[in-house]
């Protein structure tokens, strides 16, 4: 279930029946803080959760304009399931109603497929975009 950011009762109710929660964040400080609070709430509910970091731009991390992936993992306190790069193909595909996952040239789609395979128990190495 794709839930909004924040910790409303809706998020709490929707995660009640989940076997596993995927906390997806972007590498900006406000989103990471929300992800940390969400992870804390899930821990209080004894829910298993994993972290996916979306829209990663390595150049921003290298310039110090975005938090490092390791810092995000430490802050959120969750096992990393995937790293999805910022991808210029995503917005046009979404606007055209085409699922990104079917775009073989998309770096984001390749990483999303790896996340899905990991969820199914397949070993896929984590690749920094």
Where are these regions (language model features)?
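Active-site-proximal loop->helix
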Residues: 35-44
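Cytosolic-facing regulatory segments adjacent to core modules
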Residues: 1-3
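Short, small-residue-enriched loops and turns at beta-alpha junctions
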Residues: 7, 29-31, 58-60
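Short glycine-enriched loops at secondary-structure junctions
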Residues: 5-7, 86-87
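Residues at alpha-helix caps and immediate loop-helix transition turns in enzyme cores, especially N-
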Residues: 10, 34, 64-68
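Inter-motif core of Ras-like GTPase G domains
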Residues: 8-29
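C-terminal lobe/tail of nucleotide-utilizing enzymes
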Residues: 44-129
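Hydrophobic/aromatic ligand-binding patch that stacks against planar heteroaromatic rings
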Residues: 13-14, 41, 72
